[in-house]
């Protein structure tokens, strides 16, 4: 048992916190006995502390006014009542008894400095002893820092709106300039390579950097990279038009590739920080309902921003020329930066500075710092990449993660850059393209609500399987429509797009459920490293398909790319079924609450 701080104090106002009586005579007697019941969620431990007569002198120094606050129990080291009784019956001469010096003047603020990495949890649940199941549910559904969490939502709303608008803007502008998939495919391929190489390094960098200053710096760098990209595309509209293959050697295109890689790495780093670190601290790691609700809200914000961003730029592109639209996007990027910075600062302020807590213990930080001084940056980077891939392969929920990665092979039957370029070259109205992306996001928002009900009905693992099979079935219909009819007519085209829109319901359902599976199976101490490495693996899968798209860059080869995308979704469904039908002992332990065998 780890006790962060013990205060010798008792007051009638705190009687409701403790349901055991304190008798002065029993502490002053030769044989002192106290019984403390520790209740936290569904786990309960009884500790019976019996002292020998030789210990009575130390107990005499205790006051009857006693309370225990900020306690945290590591369940791996909690022993049973019998084990403690046996240890305490051992003769005193065989075991040294530590003397605890208690200071009644320690303030609550000073006690927070005693927290280490394993105790970065709010202490409300651990300070309340015996609670009813209804009271536990109410507290578990209450965020630890609700004000800070709401400000974080506002920050994500501003940042995601700009990012989603730009993700739709640049492929549309390039596709209107060059009637080929080659520039967009090369741009996506290079950015994915940057994520593959830099993902684990960025993840570990975020683990050893202060949260707020690092996040603000990433926002500034990302905004600068996006403005540079917009400037390069605007410059491409001012120079004489050349072939799609010749622009790959233009200086402005190299600058565009560099800016796109920086933009992607900054986006990955900030996304991992919010989803795997910040939201856990603000919602409370020991408040599962509040954490689940926070995750759902973040998904909805991202999808709603995708709807607003794509539709806004699509409407602008249908009324104005691409250069004017790109200038508007660049202005929006620069204008949103001060707002995001202020919201991030307010998030930390309203959460009582919880984001200022260090993310590693003193020993691990000092060890990392000494190794940084002795090793080169290249060696540290290579070791980080190897460690990330090793931890990723050894994670207990690898099949679920591989299914998630395989979905990234689907690069054309999705509202992405290649689909945008394909529809643009088919002379589809930009407002229709924006509406298609927006409807796909609407299906994602609906999936965040339906997935919770699906989990309650069939369990978390079966809910993931349902989402994957639903997506595979609808994409099979879409591919059949594409291969059997011409998309030059409106009816087949709209039916083809509608199947893809409906398939997003299954895709996003698995995204929400899969995130919960990974949060359950991945240790919190490795969440950032494994999460960033998983994104790198997913980027590797996407880059392989982009490489195929570069080889088959003509729009007539779109059907071949669509078939490959369908096969990747089918393979993801089959791999996930292996986790569902043949779980390991470790997986059974992790998902003991889930009806695996039903």
Curated annotation (Swiss-Prot):
<feature type="transit peptide" description="Chloroplast">
    <location>
        <begin position="1"/>
        <end position="54"/>
    </location>
</feature>
<dbReference type="InterPro" id="IPR036259">
    <property type="entry name" value="MFS_trans_sf"/>
</dbReference>
<feature type="transmembrane region" description="Helical">
    <location>
        <begin position="432"/>
        <end position="452"/>
    </location>
</feature>
<dbReference type="InterPro" id="IPR009716">
    <property type="entry name" value="Ferroportin-1"/>
</dbReference>
<dbReference type="GO" id="GO:0022857">
    <property type="term" value="F:transmembrane transporter activity"/>
</dbReference>
<feature type="transmembrane region" description="Helical">
    <location>
        <begin position="216"/>
        <end position="236"/>
    </location>
</feature>
<keyword id="KW-0472">Membrane</keyword>
<feature type="transmembrane region" description="Helical">
    <location>
        <begin position="326"/>
        <end position="346"/>
    </location>
</feature>
<protein>
    <recommendedName>
        <fullName>Solute carrier family 40 member 3, chloroplastic</fullName>
    </recommendedName>
</protein>
<keyword id="KW-1133">Transmembrane helix</keyword>
<feature type="transmembrane region" description="Helical">
    <location>
        <begin position="530"/>
        <end position="550"/>
    </location>
</feature>
<feature type="transmembrane region" description="Helical">
    <location>
        <begin position="557"/>
        <end position="577"/>
    </location>
</feature>
<dbReference type="GO" id="GO:0016020">
    <property type="term" value="C:membrane"/>
</dbReference>
<keyword id="KW-0150">Chloroplast</keyword>
<keyword id="KW-0406">Ion transport</keyword>
<comment type="function">
    <text>Probable plastid transporter that may play a role in iron chelation, storage or sequestration under limiting iron conditions. In presence of exogenous antibiotics, may allow opportunistic entry of multiple aminoglycoside antibiotics into the chloroplast.</text>
</comment>
<feature type="transmembrane region" description="Helical">
    <location>
        <begin position="402"/>
        <end position="422"/>
    </location>
</feature>
<feature type="transmembrane region" description="Helical">
    <location>
        <begin position="252"/>
        <end position="272"/>
    </location>
</feature>
<feature type="transmembrane region" description="Helical">
    <location>
        <begin position="463"/>
        <end position="483"/>
    </location>
</feature>
<dbReference type="GO" id="GO:0009941">
    <property type="term" value="C:chloroplast envelope"/>
</dbReference>
<feature type="transmembrane region" description="Helical">
    <location>
        <begin position="493"/>
        <end position="513"/>
    </location>
</feature>
<keyword id="KW-0809">Transit peptide</keyword>
<feature type="transmembrane region" description="Helical">
    <location>
        <begin position="297"/>
        <end position="317"/>
    </location>
</feature>
<keyword id="KW-0934">Plastid</keyword>
<keyword id="KW-0813">Transport</keyword>
<dbReference type="Pfam" id="PF06963">
    <property type="entry name" value="FPN1"/>
</dbReference>
<dbReference type="GO" id="GO:0005381">
    <property type="term" value="F:iron ion transmembrane transporter activity"/>
</dbReference>
<feature type="transmembrane region" description="Helical">
    <location>
        <begin position="182"/>
        <end position="202"/>
    </location>
</feature>
<dbReference type="GO" id="GO:0006879">
    <property type="term" value="P:intracellular iron ion homeostasis"/>
</dbReference>
<keyword id="KW-0812">Transmembrane</keyword>
<dbReference type="GO" id="GO:0005739">
    <property type="term" value="C:mitochondrion"/>
</dbReference>
<comment type="similarity">
    <text>Belongs to the ferroportin (FP) (TC 2.A.100) family. SLC40A subfamily.</text>
</comment>
<dbReference type="GO" id="GO:0009507">
    <property type="term" value="C:chloroplast"/>
</dbReference>
